[in-house]
Swiss-Prot record:
GO molecular function, one term: ATP binding
Broad class of where this protein is predominantly found: cytoplasm
InterPro entries named in the record: aa-tRNA-synth_Ic (IPR002305), Rossmann-like_a/b/a_fold (IPR014729), S4_RNA-bd_sf (IPR036986), Tyr-tRNA-ligase (IPR002307), Tyr-tRNA-ligase_bac-type (IPR024088), Tyr-tRNA-ligase_bac_1 (IPR024107)
Binding site for L-tyrosine: Y38, Y175, Q179
Name listed for the protein in its UniProt record: Tyrosine--tRNA ligase
Family: Belongs to the class-I aminoacyl-tRNA synthetase family. TyrS type 1 subfamily.
PROSITE patterns: S4
Residue ranges annotated as motif 'KMSKS' region: 235-239
Protein role: Catalyzes the attachment of tyrosine to tRNA(Tyr) in a two-step reaction: tyrosine is first activated by ATP to form Tyr-AMP and then transferred to the acceptor end of tRNA(Tyr).
Database matches in CDD domains: S4 (cd00165), TyrRS_core (cd00805)
Subunit (UniProt): Homodimer.
Length: 418
């Protein structure tokens, strides 16, 4: 695809670009002027996780290429819940929880983009500003009349739930109208012309573009990014231990570095393009590495991704500590997992320990690991699937080193009792 604007060309070359409404007109516009662009995040948790990282990186690049990134926090729409990609309704959150989550998300985003009053500074907006005081009758007359239920039923977020005979509340069914209305309000208030979201948001985004056209606003544009899956078909940002959060108190910078260090070989090149700011020629060099050498590319991925999220100094320190751990047998940089003393006193089965620590997802995978001689306690291979961790392991040491293969290691420590 031949594109003139630096921003769209960049998205396409790095693998972000999925589809776009009237891409030629948007390309011309973005090559000539600053285009205010919004990406929305619902306030369903106190942080964002790696699954949102593509959108956050795009906010960062909007700023880099001279456009204005608008972050819309859905403290209004979170009260309803987006049905896109969901099998069931979300748990309803109270207003205090939503506001606390919004503050946490803002703290995360400040690490990635600069907020301020400049022409390309990030702008934080909350949609409760206009949604909380909506007059329902006026909203139906002025906005609702532009939506066809027949058309809404064809969108995946609705159609798939109905086909699977899963409940879709009227509350959730309204989400599309509210997201479309958000776009209109952002255009009226801040001259926002472009909305970007994941590929699962295409229906909602197009509805907003169409609503703008029917209300005779300036032409609005929508762009979606590719859904990022690992080579094993899993969504980004999930591990056996839970979500890979972007704030350090919910997911440590060390664990964040290790998450990217341990990606599959097949994912390294793609993730370097998506989650680092390395130039493409450097990434091409790293993609040529084969065999054991590919670990150097993984270390680069981990360090560069951690640098953006947690800062350069922290990233370099973690990389240096990892070098000691994996190449100099120094355990000081390992993540720590705590176990209850009473469980260890009774004898903690190695199968259970591998699961609760997050090193293995299931008992069957833990058994396979042991049978393949891939599990070690203090660098000694565990041969018995019935092996148990006991207090004797801690007689002369403050921790036990638990290893799965060559890459995954944890320090197992006893919880302090007070």
């Amino acid at each position: 695809m031949k594109l003139e604007s630096q921003f769209l060309s960049f998205l396409y070359s790095r693998g972000y670009f999925n589809q776009c409404t009237n891409v030629s007109a948007l390309d011309q516009l973005m090559s000539k002027q600053c285009v205010p662009t919004y990406i929305g995040f619902d306030c369903t948790a106190k942080s964002l996780h790696v699954g949102s990282l593509v959108q956050i990186m795009i906010l960062r690049y909007l700023q880099k290429f001279g456009h204005k990134p608008i972050v819309l926090l859905g403290n209004g729409t979170t009260k309803i819940g987006d049905p896109s990609g969901k099998d069931k309704s979300r748990t309803m959150l109270c207003s205090d929880e939503i506001e606390e989550n919004a503050l946490g998300i803002y703290d995360v985003l400040k690490k990635f983009i600069k907020f301020g009053s400049g022409s390309t500074d990030g702008l934080l907006v909350c949609n409760a500003e206009w949604l909380d005081d909506l007059n329902y009758i006026e909203f139906l007359r002025n906005i609702g009349r532009h939506f066809s239920v027949n058309n809404m039923l064809t969108f995946d977020s609705v159609r798939l739930r109905l086909e699977r005979e899963q409940n879709l509340s009227f509350l959730e069914f309204n989400y599309m109208l509210l997201q479309s209305y958000d776009f209109v309000e952002l255009n009226r208030r801040y001259n926002c012309l472009l909305q970007i979201g994941g590929s699962d948001q295409w229906g909602n985004i197009v509805s907003g573009v169409e609503l703008g056209r029917k209300l005779q606003l300036s032409e609005l544009f929508g762009l979606t990014t590719n859904l990022v899956l690992t080579s094993s078909g899993e969504k980004m940002g999930k591990t056996a231990q839970g979500a890979v959060w972007l704030n350090g108190d919910m997911y440590s910078p060390v664990d964040y570095w290790q998450y990217f260090r341990n990606v599959r070989d097949e994912d390294v090149g793609r993730f370097l393009k998506l989650f680092t700011e390395l130039p493409l020629d450097k990434i091409k060099e790293l993609e040529l590495l084969q065999g054991h050498e590919i670990n150097e590319a993984k270390k680069m991925l981990a360090t560069e991704a951690t640098k953006i999220c947690h800062g350069e100094e922290i990233a370099k320190n973690i990389a240096a500590d990892a070098l000691k751990v994996f190449e100099c047998n120094d355990d000081s940089g390992l993540s720590t997992f705590y176990v209850d003393r009473c469980d260890v006193d009774l004898g903690l089965p190695i199968i259970k320990l591998l699961q609760i620590s997050g090193l293995e997802k299931s008992s069957s995978s833990a058994r396979r690991l042991i049978n393949d001689k891939g599990c070690k306690i203090n660098d000694v291979v565990v041969l018995d699937v019935n092996y148990k961790l006991s207090l004797e392991h801690f007689c002369n040491a403050s921790y036990v080193k638990l290893s799965c293969g060559k890459k995954r290691h944890l320090k197992i420590m006893l919880k302090s009792s007070f």
